[in-house]
Amino acid sequence: VLANKMDAPNTQEVDIAGNVCESGDLFARDRPMPDVEEGDLLAILNAGAYGFTMSSNYNSRPKASEVLVKDGECFLTRERETFEDLFNKQIIPDYLQ
C-alpha cells in the first residue's frame, strides 16, 4: 500500500519487486495502485524475508532499518546498514596490497 496515499483511487496495476536481481524477488503482480511518484512511501506488510532475521547482504545490499509502529507512533529499532558496514571487517592480505 502507498502509506502516504491511502485514500487515493487506484489508477493502474503494477508489479512490486525487491531490490535484488532474481526473478523470484517479487512481492506482487498486477497490484492495483494509485499513481506512484518519487518520494511516495510504499508499505509492504508481512514481508518477513526483508526483516533483519531473514535478510542477507546478497549482492552487497546493506540491510534496511527497522521501525516498530505502535498506536500510530514510530520507533526506530535498528539503524540501516551502510556500505562501509559491509566491508569494515574485511582484511586484505599483505600480498594483495
What are these model-predicted stretches?
Residues 1-97:
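Charged (often Lys/Glu-rich) extended helix/loop segments that serve as interaction or gating elements
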